[in-house]
Amino acid sequence: MRNLLNQIIEEIAGPIVLLDESFSNETISDKNLSNSRFYKCEFKNIVFDTVIFRKSEFSQCRFQNCQILGSDLTRVEFGNTSFTSCEFKQVDLSGSLFTNAQFSETKFEEILLIGLILSDLKIKTTTFHDLEFSKTYPVRIHKLKKVRKVSNLNSFQEILADFYFE
């Protein structure tokens, strides 16, 4: 079914809860999906443009060839979620949590990372440019029960090198 995700968003007109759904080849623009829950969902070739996902949750989801542009992902939780060939551009990830997430061939550009928490990541061929950090609320990176606080790009990339896989 074409534009299934857009149809669901229009019908519900508020926070949505989705389980075991698959979406492809859609553009979602100027929507507020705050407090939504996505479980075991697959997103292929989806463009999220100026979408508010504040306080939403993605658990065991897969994103492939997706673009997340100019969007608000503050305090969003991503658990056991994978991103392959995706692009995050001009996105606010402040206060968000990525646990057991996997990034492969993904780009991050012009990203706000205030208070972001990263835990047990797997990263492959992923690039980071124009990231904004905070010394007051640094990025916290967890690995094997050790926590590192990061407030600049050099230390961020140095620590993330430990998460790269072949």
Regions found by a protein language model. Give the residues of each.
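Tandem repeat scaffolds
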Residues: 1-166
